[in-house]
């Protein structure tokens, strides 16, 4: 029986259990590693002795061997080492967190089995700048862009785009003020905003030309399978710039969309460049029918779209993990280490 390791956390959504159930139907054994409980409730050990490598995951009296897993799905590592601040003195926290990350991600990098996407490849995707350079190199349209912490450069960019510009962060995060979460969304920026832009010096932002939208696309790629959905975000005023502001309102408004073959092939080549088998891609279709690539997210959400097609995406993830469906990229490893079975 093949074993599949899923890296996630206790507050992840329903997709984990749906994929796990699909894996079990294919006669696989699922090991779920909730990394928010590591290291307080989990122990992770990698040992080399007598010419053999062994990896053990211990949790509540149960020991799992990881050196013999057939595949890994690195879903997310949110809240890694949650609660550590309650048991360690503040002066040790930074060092401990560093060692925890090194141990977990070092173990994952050293697992010579199929992985839908390696952590190192996903970290490469953190560079929105490289994403756009690669996408444009593949022939995809990308918006005019300026990534800067220079207020003067930002002013020049906005003034050069009188039809409109937007400002957004390169990473997803929220600001907590008086215990309330404030998600940072994409916003329109005009010359009127430029008088208050001096604080940009302390935190870079990404500025782009404002693309008029006929449709917004979310494309989920798993192996060779491409699932494309479209939404008319312009029907709701508060969703026109960033549809996530009205994500719940638009939840049932997404429809399957036939992506042009030329665009599909370029997106698959993008996956090959990054050597990954999962990606969630955002694209704008303008009124002239032109496709503008915005970004690819290595762990982009898909569950609300999965519901619209009776769980086909989750089923495909399970099949790709087990080699029951075509894999877009399979690693070639030289000098395989010897693992104890």
Residue ranges and their predicted role:
Residues 49-51, 59-60, 221-225, 233, ...:
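Short acidic-glycine loop/turn motifs at beta-strand connectors
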Residues 282:
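Nucleotide-cofactor and metal-assisted catalytic machinery
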